[in-house]
């Protein structure tokens, strides 16, 4: 994902406006900041881009998940279903909320399988987190329909799919809330940072207060006199991050256009290559063009194909062996090793769920990932670079497939 690839004068100009005021904190200092509220402006423009009413900036995509879970009322002992192919932060945020993550299978979108999600629902299930992995939407319509039927909250983890859409609506905007990441390897970056979006005012207010020690942000009084109705924590974004985010958000339409152009030729080649199957897009789905993901006939061919193209200088990922994105490889989660005594929240005091995490509990996910190759798409790809990638892929296909 591009993020860090385009950093320059736009970002520098925005940050300098913050330095000119001397106010790096997002709240207070009305006179000194001279009308410069970078985080607030970033939130407003990000909400507009995604077609929602509200956005709350936070310190990371990981904390965005935690804040959103708190805002949605997830509590200790609740079960939250999510997919076994995701960055580990999705599971960590559920555990941080005191809830129990229930792993579910993926399908040929490389995202949550709606049918397995439905099978995993129990009376303790309170939410589902579909993750739009590697720039492409999950089958979000089906997931939302199942969730509504069972009275569950839908939290879209959109860290890797900013700009993707389903039926003309941005992913992240379709569920009860959506979260985004702005770390160095996301579509836009603030170095570190995240966002929670929602169309529900009460969810937004709870997120806003929880992310700022419970402050109710009453404009009629000074910050020191603001009220609070519950305990929160500090997940505030700084004005410098907000400034960089504004500049990056301004670039986003061009980023998506360039990514699409760079992706197209590679994708078309693979779509017509014998033995190759592109990942599926749900009906009405448009991806964010950050990757090309494809399946090979079996795991051995995938491993050989990956070895051949990477040895020829093509950047590619074989996620079956990835230590941070596949449930199968998280030995600390499999052993329920948390930082708290008694392995909270899995201890009997809080948890009625007797779940045994095993490395073989998601066979369908393992089967898909063992056959999957992922090609990151750089903003800086030249025509010559694209032609080189296509040539290497074509050669590997002729030799191995």
For each of these PLM feature ranges, what is it?
Residues 1-71, 75, 96, 121, ...:
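Conserved PLP-binding active-site segment in aminotransferase class I/II-type PLP enzymes
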Residues 29, 34, 161-167, 174-291:
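Active-site region of PLP-dependent enzymes
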Residues 70-158, 165:
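PLP-dependent aminotransferase-like
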Residues 207, 303-312, 389-393:
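Short amphipathic alpha-helices in soluble, non-transmembrane regions
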Residues 215-223, 265-269, 306-372:
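Conserved PLP cofactor-binding pocket of PLP-dependent enzymes
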Residues 280-283, 289-299, 319-339, 371-382:
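Conserved PLP-binding active-site segment of the aspartate aminotransferase-like
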Residues 299-305, 382-387:
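Short, conserved charged micro-motifs
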């Amino acid at each position: 994902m591009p993020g860090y690839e385009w950093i320059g004068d736009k970002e520098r100009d925005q940050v300098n406006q913050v330095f000119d005021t001397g106010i790096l904190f997002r709240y207070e200092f009305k006179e000194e900041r001279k009308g410069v509220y970078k985080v607030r402006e970033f939130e407003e423009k990000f909400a507009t881009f995604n077609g929602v009413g509200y956005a709350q900036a936070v310190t990371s995509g990981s904390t965005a998940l935690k804040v959103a879970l708190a805002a949605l009322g997830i509590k200790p002992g609740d079960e939250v279903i999510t997919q076994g192919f995701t960055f580990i932060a999705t599971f960590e945020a559920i555990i941080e909320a005191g809830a129990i993550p229930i792993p579910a299978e993926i399908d040929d979108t490389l995202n949550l399988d709606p049918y397995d999600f439905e099978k995993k629902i129990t009376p303790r299930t309170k939410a589902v987190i579909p993750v739009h992995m590697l720039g492409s939407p999950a089958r979000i319509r089906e997931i939302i329909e199942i969730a509504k039927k069972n009275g569950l909250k839908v939290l879209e983890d959109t860290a890797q799919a900013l700009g993707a859409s389903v039926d003309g609506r941005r992913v992240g905007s379709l569920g009860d809330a959506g979260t985004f990441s702005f770390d160095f390897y996301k579509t836009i970056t603030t170095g570190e940072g995240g966002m929670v979006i929602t169309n529900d005012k009460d969810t937004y207010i709870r997120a806003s207060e929880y992310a700022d020690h419970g402050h109710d942000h009453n404009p009629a009084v000074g910050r020191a006199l603001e009220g609070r109705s519950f305990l929160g924590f500090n997940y505030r974004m700084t004005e410098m991050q907000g400034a960089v985010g504004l500049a990056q958000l301004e670039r986003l339409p061009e980023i998506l256009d360039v990514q699409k152009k760079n992706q197209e030729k590679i994708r078309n080649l693979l779509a017509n290559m014998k033995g190759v199957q592109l990942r599926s897009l749900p009906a009405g789905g448009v991806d964010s063009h950050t990757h090309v993901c494809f399946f090979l006939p079996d795991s051995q061919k995938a491993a050989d194909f990956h070895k051949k193209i990477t040895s020829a200088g093509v950047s590619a990922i074989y996620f079956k062996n990835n230590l941070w994105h596949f449930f199968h490889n998280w030995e600390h989660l499999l052993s329920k090793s948390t930082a708290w005594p008694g392995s909270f929240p899995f201890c009997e005091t809080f948890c009625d769920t007797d779940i045994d995490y095993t490395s073989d509990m998601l066979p369908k996910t393992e089967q898909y990932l063992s056959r999957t190759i992922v090609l990151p798409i750089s903003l800086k790809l030249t025509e010559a670079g694209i032609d080189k990638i296509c040539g290497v892929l074509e050669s590997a296909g002729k030799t191995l497939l």
